[in-house]
Amino acid sequence: MVQEYDVIVIGAGHAGVEAGLASARRGAKTLMLTINLDNIAFMPCNPSVGGPAKGIVVREIDALGGQMAKTIDKTHIQMRMLNTGKGPAVRALRAQADKVLYQQEMKRVIEDEENLHIMQGMVDELIIEDNEVKGVRTNIGTEYLSKAVIITTGTFLRGEIILGNMKYSSGPNHQLPSITLSDNLRELGFDIVRFKTGTPPRVNSKTIDYSKTEIQPGDDVGRAFSFETTEYILDQLPCWLTYTNAETHKVIDDNLHLSAMYSGMIKGTGPRYCPSIEDKFVRFNDKPRHQLFLEPEGRNTNEVYVQGLSTSLPEHVQRQMLETIPGLEKADMMRAGYAIEYDAIVPTQLWPTLETKMIKNLYTAGQINGTSGYEEAAGQGLMAGINAAGKVLNTGEKILSRSDAYIGVLIDDLVTKGTNEPYRLLTSRAEYRLLLRHDNADLRLTDMGYELGMISEERYARFNEKRQQIDAEIKRLSDIRIKPNEHTQAIIEQHGGSRLKDGILAIDLLRRPEMTYDIILELLEEEHQLNADVEEQVEIQTKYEGYINKSLQQVEKVKRMEEKKIPEDLDYSKIDSLATEAREKLSEVKPLNIAQASRISGVNPADISILLIYLEQGKLQRVSD
């Protein structure tokens, strides 16, 4: 008997688990197929979650009802807030994961999720009828039927591991690769590219001389990614910092001809922002040293991840490199680093919902779309799961805008501009980063998560209470006047402020750079009554109000452009005045509105003006008809 589902998810990595959970939580009967049930949510590369921009994505996933934040909060070994000396727009949380515990916890969550069924199996082929996906067929001939399919295959598609002059078929960490499915996508007509990533060696902690390294402890206060987390892990493990040196660089230089990067063996394009150590040596040969972070892979293992030493050099050369690094001179290498090449689809073949333009009800998410990183994959998986379930159940799809979330920036960049290298999310990619902060992800997205059925009534009630407290406190401070008496003058001067000449509203005093919410309470002789996150919002929203309002005005302009819709079936070849490049790019991307069209590389303002005139003439023609 053939089994039938609403949604099938191929793969159970970081994109797959979020896709499967989101689909099931929206009420779709969902099947998740994975090559190995023991490797659900596996971390084949760095054992960490978060960091600049990426940490904000994890918060956004949580605000929309996803899982990554909750799981890392329960399984991390260290957590740090980054960029605390900078403005709120670039602050981000980063956690070191216990990679085994993370896997185990995520597997437990998936197994317990209602509507989500899990099966070990390798998908070889999509079942397609009239350009619409109808299900999948495995390598042993089993068929599963469904109304939608989400492909989240990571680096498994025609994966090949490269080490020195050796190259062999493999998924990450020497797992089985998926070869036939990649062939099937080519046969269906998808444009496929070849990308590359890599990983460093792991060493035995017992053989590291930590006295020659610099300790990197976690924060000594409770931190969490999830807005629902109330219990914090304070028993943390440190990371350690060391550096390469002239000796290390000589080993690389002497053996560069053995690197697959420079021998011509690697054909795929590697990640710009996570280069191998040999690539760093060649590209930045003026630098006398490069940072290396020694990151424990968990509480119950001695394996330490040497971040910054990603390499495809032969194993014996990797040992020689380690012997030159302070603290690692006698380190026992437990796993060698390697490079991995894999197939990815050109992401401009997708709609902003992550549904493919070529095959109806077929979605893709994660590294198959040309991205790098667990967080980028998880964000895409979440949206693909939300949209696939929404489409088949007729409960609505959702497209995040660039002003809604970093996830929106990520997906818009992929489907509008494409990428010729593994895409990494950066704060600099977001034009509204003051709006897309770590601290306000819930204020931006919880309403949306609730409307999509991803947020519980209890959580939504708590969120609304928080929002009301923020608004009420800002209003209260706007009604209180602080008088320039000796008490207030002394406190203000003590904190580096200038004396008051006249009375001032508490909210206006808080806008001064040297003032904080704590100081305002001191001036008012009041105790703390609100939660720290409410107080933080009051301070940030007050201090940055002018800048935030300017950003919101820019958002409104873009929204007006987004309201100018473009028909999906518009034939750009009939618009004679368009430049040839613009016509080709617009035909390829098929933008949904003028705002998206304006972001396509090769489409200039003159082309947009021509397109607007053409659309307006079309409307007038329809009215006259």
Curated annotation (Swiss-Prot):
The record's listing under HAMAP family reads: MnmG_GidA (MF_00129)
Q: Which Gene3D superfamilies match?
A: FAD/NAD(P)-binding domain (3.50.50.60), GidA associated domain, C-terminal subdomain (1.10.150.570), tRNA uridine 5-carboxymethylaminomethyl modification enzyme MnmG/GidA (1.10.10.1800)
Sum up the protein's function in the record's words.
NAD-binding protein involved in the addition of a carboxymethylaminomethyl (cmnm) group at the wobble position (U34) of certain tRNAs, forming tRNA-cmnm(5)s(2)U34.
A Gene Ontology term for the protein's cellular component: cytosol
Superkingdom of the source species: Bacteria
**Which cellular compartments is it found in?**
Cytoplasm
Q: How does it assemble?
A: Homodimer. Heterotetramer of two MnmE and two MnmG subunits.
Residues reported to bind FAD = G11, A12, G13, H14, A15, G16, V123, S178, Q367
Q: Which GO terms describe its biological process?
A: tRNA methylation; tRNA wobble uridine modification
| SMART domains noted in UniProt | GIDA_assoc_3 (SM01228)
Cite the PANTHER family for this sequence: GLUCOSE INHIBITED DIVISION PROTEIN A, PROTEIN MTO1 HOMOLOG, MITOCHONDRIAL
Q: Which GO terms describe its molecular function?
A: flavin adenine dinucleotide binding
Which cofactors must be present for this protein to function? FAD
Its protein name is tRNA uridine 5-carboxymethylaminomethyl modification enzyme MnmG
Q: What range does the record give for the signal peptide? A: none
Q: Which InterPro entries match?
A: FAD/NAD-bd_sf, GIDA_C_N, MnmG, MnmG-rel, MnmG-rel_CS, MnmG_C, MnmG_C_subdom, MnmG_C_subdom_sf
- What family is it from? Belongs to the MnmG family.
